[in-house]
Amino acid sequence: MKRIAILFFLFNTVIIFAQQQVTGVVKDNTGTPLPGVNIVEKGTNNGVSTDIDGSYKITVKEGASLIFTYVGYNSVTRLANASQIDVALSEEGGQNLDEVVVTGSRTAQRSNTTTPLPIDVISSKDLTSTGQATFDKALQYKIPSFNTVQTPVNDATSLLDPYEIRNLGPSRTLILINGKRKNLSSLLYVQTSPGRGETGADISAIPTDAIERVEILRDGASAQYGSDAIAGVMNIILKKNYTDGSITVRSGITSEGDGEMLGVSLNNGTTVGEKGFLNYTIDFSKVNLANRPGNVDAQGEADDFLDGSPAAVATVNEFLSRHPDARNINGSPETAAAKFLINGGSPISDNTNLYYNAAYVYKKVNSFANFRTPYWRPLSGDPYLNDLFGNGNDANPSYDGYGPTFEGDLSDYNGTLGFKSVKNGWNTDASVTVGGNKQTYTVNNSVNRSSILDADGNETYRENSPISFKPGGTSFNHVVGNIDISKILSDQISIGFGTEFRSEYFTVMEGDQASWDGAGADSFAGNLPENSGKWNRYNVGVYLDVAFDITKDFLINGAVRHEEYSDFGGATVWKASTRYKFLDDKITLRGSVSTGFRAPTLHQIYTQKSQYSFVPGEGIQVSGIINNVSPQARKLGVSQLQPEKSTSVTVGFGAKPFKNFNITVDYYNIKIEDRVTLGDRQYEVIPATDPAEQDEIIGEVAYFSNAFDSRTSGLDVVTGYNNIGIGEGKLGFNLSGNITFQNERISAIKNNSSFSDILNSLTFTSRPKTKWILGINYEIGKFGFSLNNTYFGESTFNQDGLASNEVRDADGKLVRIPGSTETERDDSANLKTEFLAKIVTDLGVNFNATEKLTIALNVNNLFNILPEWKFVAENEAGAALLADPAAVKTQSNLITFNQRYSRMTYDGSHFSQLGTTFNLSVNYKF
């Protein structure tokens, strides 16, 4: 026993003397302390971060090396051969693949090269260099797998542009702020635009100047983070600096002289107590309307709204001679925004830190519906319009149409309060997060055309209609509680586990009566009382994450998670990943396989935008969207919504064959089962069960369902070669791309769903199958130059029955639609539209006038490249149509609303239709 005790003592003595404690301070090359610098013992998971004063303390093995990394700075490696090691980091060289990332693992932090998952890291400098006005648009020109688009005349969609990663819609990317879940928007996209039927967080609300970096995990991560992480995770890391600040004044204008932009942003920091910090950002911006209408085709208008005769064309031409664009306003809306954000933290003991962040955003957007021309509803048919809209002229002195406006007020807030502590090597993080989004709407210059009589027999609307309406709105709120615990058990094993509780609330606010009564406000009817209400649910999740470094080169990682929802039950998902390095870490092989889930949002379950009306002889008719829990949905055979389930596989490699050069290539394959989809509007009739009752007619309605299974596969490529000495300056190249191999439905349509060619296009084919970004930057002296080229590949859009065939009976006669003079047409499409591949070039020049003053000029879309599409024949009948100019014009009128949207159809595009824009900013540091 005595010998064992002696051996035990000697063993522990060796361990103690084989380790050493290293302390120091990390500063930048101006001598300013840097908080949050990552220090990792090379070849291990052992790491710490610098405190508010740039100081650190770490225990490492004797003879170890320390790697110091910070976003936007060169990484530095130092041999731990002293008890105090002070380090100065230089901004030259910017980010690299050795940056430590916090996304993708619930155990130890790892660098980009040691993580088994594909992660993009975008610094604040990268974002601002794009010259884009908002965070989401900056990502569009930095991340090939990220797409966002602005669509014209789309009501509430104008408040929040849809975005997506890997063409999987906004609902399947989880947004985090400092690692905590951000609230969803209250907006449900219901228009014919990308993202239809989905919702996502409002990332455009986050001020760019508040962001230190963005980590984008391009891999399924439901096992670590829960619902919504099927396509990936975007973690927005906020700035922590407190010793300096800056103010930026931004201005911009398009090459056509509209869309004027003016903004000012302040980012600053201060100390709180001895070692606490507070960083804050205040941002105000105003963007004016930019209008890109087309010249309207008179014959198409006469055919659609009149009888198509020469007299009808003359009537239309009288108006178009004065207003060739039919007074339509479509482009980018008028927007004003105010954004406030804070991020802070303070130590409350030797091993416990308090942290917090909060943000509030207010945004007002003013857009327009299609202009109601006088020949749409002639004064002879509705004489009251002259009293409401007396805007005539000499040729038509009484009435000249009206243009409804759509005005939206959006507010978004989020906040987190938490504690992090370290005790006996156990890291504990406990937090509470709240967040919400509210949108209310106003419709002006419109009318309720319904013939509804009051008790005295007078018209309630029509000639007595108001011209301003409050259609109501929506709100979404959540409360999230998290407890995350992790520990590095040894040089080889680290674990993480935790729990999350989340409560969600969705509200549909009733509009004023005039906005919904009868047909409601023209252009945008309000929320009916029976469609309004408040709904909520809660869920609890637990997870376990284990990482095992079998050797310093070979890592395996596994995670499992179970969530229980109050409305649909439980879901269990898992993930396994691995990474292997060789050739002195020059080559890294990595891969992962995982299952995931996405719970249908409360918006998708409970949204109902329907109009009920009685039609003599036909009973009650319902049109619009019926919600998933309505009796009508059950009668139509629509099942209760269930979570989407996914299986994701990613395989790739990274290489650093020589200094300053890196490349990563990752293949992904994502299968989604029971995809939640908003189907097409369709005409439905529910037979009455009682012969004494009338059938219930479910008119032009759409509804959500688990409609089909899908598969998306592709390749992500990221490469960079930086710090190349050219003369007295430094040159850098970055090339990244996303190639989609497969993005399609792989099952039959389920649950009595309707899924047309249009929906198939919006879901699968209307986004670029290929997107590449080539960036070149050169810095010399006080000047910096950047040239960014973004290649948007081809995409296609199939309209339902575009140039379809007329239906004939057995005798070869044309079949008429009952009660109409129109001819029935089949569902075939002889033509489709194809958006042509385009390269958009952005040029940036910045001048460091002094150490504190920087002037930057960005010319976005330098060569004024505009979206362009063409017809493509699907068959011989389509080819014959393309040979007939008159037929081509007719079909073109169908998808551009008689050329109103000649630049950008309702089908969407992939970059701005505004053309060249000029942006000038002045930044002053203090």
Residue ranges and their predicted role:
Residues 243, 256-369, 374-381, 385-386, ...:
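Transmembrane beta-barrel wall of Gram-negative outer-membrane proteins
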Residues 57-59, 140-185:
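Extracytoplasmic beta-strand/coil segments of soluble accessory domains associated
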Residues 27-32, 37-42, 65-74, 82-128, ...:
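Short, acidic, small-residue-rich periplasmic hinge/interaction motif at the N-terminus
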Residues 83-90, 137-138, 142, 163, ...:
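N-terminal periplasmic accessory domains that precede
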Residues 662, 667-801, 925:
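Gram-negative outer-membrane beta-barrel transporters
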Residues 56-58, 180-218:
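Short acidic/polar hinge/loop motifs at secondary-structure boundaries
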Residues 394-396, 402-417, 421, 434, ...:
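Outer-membrane beta-barrel transmembrane domain signature of Gram-negative proteins
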Residues 7, 185, 788-818, 847-926:
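C-terminal beta-signal and adjacent terminal beta-strands/loops
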